[in-house]
Amino acid sequence: TRTSHDHMRERSARVNFGRQWLDKSILEIYREDIVRFRVLLSGDVQEDALALISTGQVPKLRSLQVHNSTVYRWNRPCYGISDNGKPHLRIENRVLPSGPTVLDEVANAALWLGCMVQMHDDVGDIRNKIGFEDVYDNFGKAAKFGIDSKFTWMFDQKIPVVELALKELIPRARKGLEMRNVHPDSISRYMDVIEERATEHMNGARWALRSYTKLKKETTEDEALTVLTYAMCVNEKSGIPVHKWKMPELKDLKEYRPSGLKVSEFMTTDLFTV
């Protein structure tokens, strides 16, 4: 009656961080995707890619595009053809959406892009500086502990994420943006947001958790979530970066109308039974 998993084929999650560093080219990722993941979507593709290449034309590789769209890597390479007819390879990553304001999102993008430019010159081949297993572990820590994480950095250095941001990442990002001739005022504006966020030890996730914990002590779960959502909408529209947001108060929401709630939205589920 018990199923043993010791000898079953290992399957990778379609939502994943990755398994190892790339060694030679992006083809390694596409090969892995084709081998490890079953086809979910298909269609009638008439294109003969090899024939097009032999005549100097650029294939759309529609089947590859569709299959790639069903595998959700943290950094996903996407093949496409630009409006000018030239093929390109772009990288989709999950850094940009973690605002919650537009200013925070652009600051995140500036930090990431600046670091990518400068670390190429400062570090070179990062595979010689840090193992993929440590990077994978850091990713898990960041997802679980956020701004309170402690990472394994290059050369096996242990460093809190705030210290890493202030001492390593932000200075490198500033230099990288300068190398790409970004206006000094823009560099200061966006890097100051990241620096203040680290100094204040506050980001979107931490603000939401602290706010919910505070409100939950003062009212029901439903009203706490309603006030929290309202506060997030108001703060987001203000354009003020998240590290400057105040903790929400119940009085911030002028009208709370729970009369239309379902039983499941206000009932208590934490019960003692005998």
Residue ranges and their predicted role:
Residues 1-26, 135-202, 212-213:
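C-terminal, helix-dominated tail/subdomain
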Residues 25, 66-69, 88, 103-114, ...:
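Generic recognition of stable, solvent-exposed alpha-helical segments in well-folded globular domains
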Residues 83-88, 100-103, 240, 250:
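Charged, well-structured binding/catalytic surfaces in domain cores that contact anionic ligands
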Residues 85, 165, 255-259:
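A generic short alpha-helical patch detector that favors 3-5-residue windows
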Residues 96-99, 180, 269-270:
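Alpha-helix C-capping/helix-to-loop hinge sites
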Residues 195-274:
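Tandem CBS (Cystathionine beta-synthase) repeat/Bateman regulatory domains
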